[in-house]
Amino acid sequence: MKELEERIVQQGTVKPGNVLKVDAFLNHQCDVELFDHMGAAWAEHFKGKTIDKILTIEASGIGIACVVARHFGNVPVVFAKKAQSINLDGDQYTTTVYSFTKQKEFPVIVSKRYLNEGDHVLLIDDFLANGKALKGLIELCHEAGATVEGIGIAVEKGFQGGGDQLREEGYDVDSLAIVESMDPENGTIEFRS
């Protein structure tokens, strides 16, 4: 998606350790109009698929997922929580994932009330690096008996291989911007064509 790539080049910052900072418009301050355009792009890509639920992971995916849901008939958005809390009651699906950004493992939890057998789920997230978070969400869907219809990613770090691995496993991954390489010394970002 050219618009997203242009925003990344204009407002993104390449940091050491393969970190791409896009907090000016994607995952701290949110550009809702951009999210709306992203939703339209995913609605076009996943046209013809039954989507009756969107699943993401807290926190950065929530804003994107809520705007995207409007393009799929206002389907419910469920977000996996990263920590147990007193608000989470009843039966739950739980797995553990490794966060590239946070450099640690954490639990991801979804109430069994909100992820059900027979659901047709679109996974949405802001970033895809090594794919561990998405694999955790996929595991939760499989445990629930839900079908993963597709995966919508704002920014994929193509050089980290997670997206390619998910595609090889048969998942329909639509990344709107795939970063092929980044250089923190001169700030350059190259996209996959």
Swiss-Prot record:
Pathway note: Purine metabolism; XMP biosynthesis via salvage pathway; XMP from xanthine: step 1/1
Compartment(s): Cytoplasm
Disulfide bonds: none
Keywords: Cytoplasm, Glycosyltransferase, Purine salvage, Transferase
InterPro entries: PRibTrfase_dom, PRTase-like, Pur/Pyrimidine_PRTase, Xanthine_PRibTrfase
Entry EC no(s): 2.4.2.22
Assembly behavior: Homodimer.
Similarity annotation: Belongs to the purine/pyrimidine phosphoribosyltransferase family. Xpt subfamily.
Task of the protein: Converts the preformed base xanthine, a product of nucleic acid breakdown, to xanthosine 5'-monophosphate (XMP), so it can be reused for RNA or DNA synthesis.
Protein name as catalogued: Xanthine phosphoribosyltransferase
Species of the source: Bifidobacterium adolescentis (strain ATCC 15703 / DSM 20083 / NCTC 11814 / E194a)
